[in-house]
Amino acid sequence: VPIAGLTSKKYADELRKGISLDAVGSKIPAGNPLPFGSGGTSHLSVIDKNGNIVALTQTINYFFGSGVLVPGTGILLNNEMDDLNPKPGTSNSIEPKKRPLSSMSPTIMLKDGKPFLSVGSPGATRIITALTQIIVNVVDFRMNIQDAIDSPRIHCMTDTIFMESSIPKDVQAALAAKGHKLTVRGPVDLYFGGAQAV
């Protein structure tokens, strides 16, 4: 049961579009809550009082993984193998003894040889760009970790720049004027990762 999707305000907003207060409605088709869920990747960061540090990103890949439960254990197997490319001849093609490409990037940073930051995020291929922006915000712009995580993000791996709508309008206009294709998403959008850090 996709609880996160079913209880999502965005999913409720989608369903609400089919309801009219001005006329008798027709039959409303069942919705699809899966796109409104949080997926199957999570991250946690921990530092204890002794300075021991953990950055852990885990995934079952997408929602219920492979859909296979190990009998008697409650353990759900992932479907990470679908991250391999079915086309032969690429660096990520299906082959024996091969692990699929993954963007998971649990990160521990040291300063003067001591733990200084543990950070990671879900978000598929957007994990790398999300973490890069967060780390640059902390290291180069000297933001505290919460401000670094809360700052608006972009993602660009194709000819389109995806960005949160909270990127300043003048920046959006300048990028468009240079010929970039822009896709603007919500102001705080989990599409760009849901980073967690200490």
Model feature map: region roles:
Residues 121-143:
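Alpha-helical support elements that line or immediately flank enzyme active sites
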Residues 52-117, 141, 145:
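Active-site rim segments in enzyme catalytic domains, especially the processed small/beta chain
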Residues 145-155:
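Short, well-structured alpha-helical segments that form the helix of a local strand-helix-strand
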Residues 1-29, 137, 141, 145, ...:
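N-terminal leader/propeptide and maturation segments of large enzyme subunits in energy/redox metabolism
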Residues 1-59, 72-73, 80, 186:
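Internal maturation/activation junctions in enzymes
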Residues 23-32, 85-94, 179-182:
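Short Pro/Gly-enriched beta-strand edge/turn motifs at strand-loop
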Residues 33-37, 95-101, 186-190:
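Short Gly/Pro-enriched turn/cap motifs at secondary-structure boundaries
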Residues 42-46, 106-108, 194-198:
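Short beta-strand scaffold segments in enzyme catalytic cores
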